[in-house]
Amino acid sequence: MRYGTSADLAASAAECAKVVIAQINPHVPFSYGDALIHVSKLTAAVEVAEPLEELPTAQPSEIDRKIGGYIAELIPDGATLQIGVGGIPNAVLAALGDHKHLGLHTEALTDGVVPLIRSGVIDNSQKKVLPGKNLASLALGSKRLYEYMDYNEDLIMKDVAWTNDPFRIRENPKVM
């Protein structure tokens, strides 16, 4: 079974818990990486078929767009991105369309990275940790993001302790 959008703390929490109850939902995207729990670890499972909660994309303000543009100018081609959630991170992502060979090694996967991945701006060709793969610990976004994730072998979901390990992060070039 897969955790889907939350490889961040789910595995660690399940490992420490005395009781583990899972929701089985066909709307949860199948994800590769650490987002996995064996059925033998479950105390119980409940089937639900409800759409996932969606996080509306924060629309950048005019000031956010200016800040995002300035930040994007500082990001060199071949950099590895760690991106956050909100107006300024979305403005930065929107301003990166002319960049080349960016990598993604981030805790939070958001809607803003999908166009950059699909256009080839984010290709992970310069990364040293999981080269060629997008890396995240959790996904926060829309149905479009969840559809992008589903059975996507180019996206690896890892436990947050692994993803955010500073010794691992520093292996990548030009982390921003």
Which ranges hold each PLM region?
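Conserved phosphate- and dinucleotide-binding cores of soluble alpha/beta proteins
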Residues: M1-M176
